[in-house]
Structures are given as C-alpha cells and as structure tokens.
C-alpha cells in the first residue's frame, strides 16, 4: 500500500534480502540517527557491516522473514524497535535491539508500533527482550563460546531448551519481579534452570570479550525498576554482595559463601599444666574450635585413667573443685572454650547450645510441649521447664520472694515478671546505658526526681569501678526467700529457661581469646 504522509513524508520500497517491503520515510530534517542506522542495517549487503560498531554482530543475510509493517501507525518517537515479531510483541518498543539473531529464521527487520506503544516501554508479562540500553557485559567460562558459539534467540520459532552458559550479566529491563520467575537477570547459573517450555529471554545476547565489571542503567520510567534503582544508579559499578541478595534472596547464600572473606581467629588454650613448676598456661593457639577441643580433651583432660576430674583452666571460678564424673568436666570446659556442639534442628532457628539438656528444653518452644504440670490441686497450668513451674508455685503459696531493692520501697511479688513491671516506676535509664532494655526495663535503680545523697554518690562511684558483670548483679533485684539469706539473681535465672541454662550466660564472659 503506497500513500503519502500528512507531514510531507514519502513512501519508498526497500529490498531486504530480496523481499520488497514498504517503508515510510519522513523528511531528511526529521529523520533521526536511529532510523538512518536502521535503513543502513536493512539495506546492507555485507554481513560484517553492522550498525552496532562491534565487528561480527551483523545479522544473517539469508532466509529472512518479512516483518509486520504498519506504516499508518507511525508514532512520534522515531527510535522504534527492530524486532522480527508481530504487533503482539511490540510492548517493548522505542529502543534499538543490540542482540543479534542467533537463528536464520529470526532475521531483524524494521517495524513500527502505534503511538500508544511507543510512548514508553511497558513490561510484557511473557517477554524479557532487552533494549539498546541493556548494555550487557558477559564473561563466558567456556572457550567455545568466545569462538562464536550461538544459542537460539528468545523469540525463535524453534525452542531448543538447554542450559544457560555460565556467565554473569545484568539487564536493566530484566524481570526483577516477574510473575512466573523467568528472565532472572543476575547469575542464571546459580539457581535452578527454568522448566521445559519456558522461554529463556536472555539467550542469544551479544557477547563481548571484555573482562570488566558489571554495569547497568535502569529505565527511569519503568515501574519494576523503582526498587532496583536504589541499588545501582546511572553506570555505577554494582556491589555484588548487596544486589545479588536483593534480587535473589533465596539463592544469594550459595554465591555469597564464596564471596565472604574468611575471618582469621586464634583460639588460645589457657589450661595450666600441673606437672610444670612454673604453673603457666599452655598458650597453644588454634585456628578452629575443633582443634582446640581435641587438644584439651587429649592433652589435658586425659582418658579413663584420670581419676581426678578437675578444671585447671586459668582463672576458673571453681578453684580446683573436682567434678564427680568426666562428662561433667567436659561440659564445664565448654564454658571456657565457647564450644556449642548442639544446634537446633528446626529450619531457620540457628541457635546452638553447649548442653544437650538445654537443646531439649529449647526445642519445646518449637513443638509447644509443656511436660511440667502444676503440682497444686485444681491448677491446670503446664510449663516447658521446671524453673517456670517453680516461679508459678508462689502464686499458690502466697509467697512473695521477689523484693524491690530500691531504698524506701517494701514491695514484693510472687513472680519476677511482676517485679520487672514494678521497677519501671522507680527506674530511669542513664544516657548510653549498655544494659538498658535487657529484660524489658532500665537497669539502674534511681528514684525519679530525687537527688542522690552523699552516701548514694559513693555507692555509685564504687559500682562504676566494678566489672560489668558485678555491676549487673548490683543493678538487679533481690529474691529473698522466707528465713533465707539475700540472694542476688541475674537475668539468666529469671529468663524462661531451666536452671541448667545458667551456664549459657557464662559463655558470654568466657576467657576465650579471639584475634
């Protein structure tokens, strides 16, 4: 169909590989560089002359198919797409396709879209074809790919399903939030390949023998790139540790395991050998916990022939008090080494424990098991550990062993949680208090709007010189049993755990040295 454009354009016939196609040509003053390049590519007879500027990226010149031409639907934007597909595939127009057709039937030709489709690129739900601004740098792992190995294009009629080449690339118009999960732009070799029958829109992209970094520029007017634009702007180099995790949170761990730099640490054995007269620590260093534990077990603890099960770790709080069994000594040494060989088996938990009993108690938080029933008649309360049941028993006995330690306050409570709520009345946190919020309320017991007396100032001065652990003890409330001495309770004894878990808190203050 021949006609004349209302703006003074003219119709001319262009032969593309022997097939005559009607092409509308606007006046020379209105023709853009993009259309000139398109005409040059369409009429060029030599396969190595191309419009991309990269040798070897020209299209095949034989067995081409005529493109679907709609001259009457020419939009205002002259930078239309060069695509072998029909109008149903014209959702991503307005750009120049840099990817060569890897199959003879997928020949590139000039086409025009309606003004509605050329105003801005729209994400087609089943297309991942990149535009000229998707400047892709790929680094092939196989030498055959660098020698010209080709793969079928994404829109080729012949759907050959094979693995992606092992490469790394980023496409600014890739499907970051594709509904079907296809078209992943980052590291396709890391995740599982797509199921059969799904197009691989990233096949057939142009290969550049460049060993550079990855660069990408997102479309500023594309909706799915609003989230990605905060990660990489303009042509800045991308941080792989951040962007991979943002694009593929499920598969980033497999890649980041190889990206993390190993942290070098030295574990020092501080066991004091009693056979030496100097009584100096062993001081041998180890790079892994496994090596340190084996060293202590073999060299210091000894085998069944050892009758005295005493811990000689430097500055051990037991001060030479023996254990009744070897396994108890082994469990105690974990307080010093920091070993926790019992991980929680539930997915996503990640907690580890030094004692199997503590792991058993912890697993009840996942299973909901509460084997400890209240011993008082008429009460159906059940608990996951015995310590919680003990705290609950004070409700029935009317005992109030948890006293407020603030001077001038004689309040007492049956449960530590009630005392914690009461302490909020008295307490205010100083600026930058490290223990603030550790158990749900500020740690320093200073009355509100009450100036400190000289005696209180001296007490505060002395407590500030104490170690952090001693300071924490002074800042906690007093649990005073009837007719018993005053006992200071730390956070570990009030947590929802068994009394055997008190050893877990001491691991935080262990003598293990890490450099």
Curated annotation (Swiss-Prot):
Compositionally biased tracts (Basic and acidic residues): 506-515
Gene Ontology biological-process entries: central nervous system development; neural crest formation; regulation of transcription by RNA polymerase II
ZnF region ranges: C2H2-type: 267-300, 309-336, 342-366, 372-396, 402-426
UniProt cross-references to SMART domains, sorted A to Z: ZnF_C2H2
Domain of life: Eukaryota
Region: Disordered, residue numbers: 149-168, 430-467, 489-515
Tissue specificity comment: At blastula and early gastrula stage (stages 9-10.25), expressed weakly throughout the ectoderm. At the late gastrula stage (stages 11.5-13), expression is restricted to the prospective neural fold region and anterior neural plate border region. Expression becomes enhanced in the prospective midbrain and hindbrain region at the late gastrula stage. Expression in the neural plate border region continues in the neurula stage with expression in the anterior region more enhanced. Expression represents the neural plate edges and part of the neural fold.
Reported induction: By FGF-signaling. By snai1/snail. By zic1, zic2, zic3 and zic5.
Matching Pfam families: zf-C2H2, zf-C2H2_15, zf_ZIC
Function as written in the Swiss-Prot or TrEMBL entry: May bind to DNA. Essential for neural crest development, converting cells from an epidermal fate to a neural crest cell fate. Does not induce anterior neural tissue.
Family: Belongs to the GLI C2H2-type zinc-finger protein family.
Name of the protein described by the UniProt record: Zinc finger protein ZIC 5
Source species of the chain: Xenopus laevis
Organism lineage string: Eukaryota, Metazoa, Chordata, Craniata, Vertebrata
């Amino acid at each position: 169909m021949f006609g004349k454009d209302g703006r003074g354009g003219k119709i001319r016939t262009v032969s593309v590989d022997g097939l005559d196609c009607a092409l509308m040509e606007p006046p020379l003053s209105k023709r853009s560089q993009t259309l000139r390049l398109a005409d040059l590519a369409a009429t060029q007879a030599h396969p190595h002359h191309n419009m991309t500027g990269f040798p070897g990226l020209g299209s095949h010149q034989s067995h081409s198919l005529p493109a679907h031409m709609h001259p009457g639907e020419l939009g205002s934007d002259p930078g239309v797409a060069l695509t072998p597909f029909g109008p149903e595939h014209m959702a991503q127009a307005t750009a120049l396709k840099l990817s060569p057709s890897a199959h003879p039937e997928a020949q590139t030709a000039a086409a025009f879209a309606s003004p509605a489709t050329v105003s801005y690129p729209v994400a087609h739900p089943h297309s991942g074809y990149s535009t000229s601004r998707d400047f892709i740098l790929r680094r092939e792992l196989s030498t055959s790919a660098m020698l010209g190995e080709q793969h079928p294009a994404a829109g080729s009629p012949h759907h050959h399903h094979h693995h992606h080449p092992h490469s790394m690339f980023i496409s600014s118009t890739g499907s970051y939030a594709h509904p079907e999960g296809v078209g992943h732009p980052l590291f396709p070799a890391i995740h599982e390949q797509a199921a059969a029958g799904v197009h691989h829109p990233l096949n057939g992209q142009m290969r550049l023998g460049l060993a550079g970094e990855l660069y990408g520029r997102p479309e500023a007017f594309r909706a799915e790139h609003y989230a990605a634009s905060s990660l990489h702007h303009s042509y800045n180099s991308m941080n792989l540790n951040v962007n991979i995790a943002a694009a593929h949170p499920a598969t980033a761990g497999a890649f980041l395991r190889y990206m993390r730099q190993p942290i070098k640490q030295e574990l020092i054995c501080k066991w004091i050998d009693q056979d030496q007269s100097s009584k100096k620590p062993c001081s041998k260093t180890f790079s892994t916990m496994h090596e340190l534990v084996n060293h202590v077990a073999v060299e210091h603890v000894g085998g069944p022939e050892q009758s005295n099960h005493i811990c000689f770790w430097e500055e051990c709080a037991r001060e030479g008090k023996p254990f009744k069994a070897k396994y108890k000594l082994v469990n105690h040494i974990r307080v010093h080494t920091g070993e926790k060989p019992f991980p929680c088996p539930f997915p996503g938990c990640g907690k580890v424990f030094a004692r199997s009993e503590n792991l058993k108690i912890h697993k009840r938080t996942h299973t909901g098991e509460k084997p400890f029933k209240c011993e008082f008649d008429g009460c159906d309360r059940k608990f996951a550990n015995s310590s919680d049941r003990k705290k609950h028993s004070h409700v029935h006995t009317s005992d109030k062993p948890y006293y407020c330690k603030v001077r001038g306050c004689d309040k007492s409570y049956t449960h530590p949680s009630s005392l914690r709520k009461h302490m909020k009345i008295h307490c205010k946190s100083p600026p930058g208090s490290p223990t603030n919020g550790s158990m749900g309320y500020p740690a320093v017991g200073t009355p509100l709007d009450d100036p400190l007396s000289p005696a209180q100032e001296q007490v505060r001065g002395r407590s500030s010189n104490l170690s952090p652990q001693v300071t924490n003890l002074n800042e906690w409330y007093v649990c005073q049993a009837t007719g018993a001495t005053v006992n200071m309770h730390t956070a570990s004894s009030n947590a929802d755990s068994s009394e055997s878990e008190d050893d877990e808190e001491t691991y935080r203050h262990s003598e293990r040295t890490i450099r």
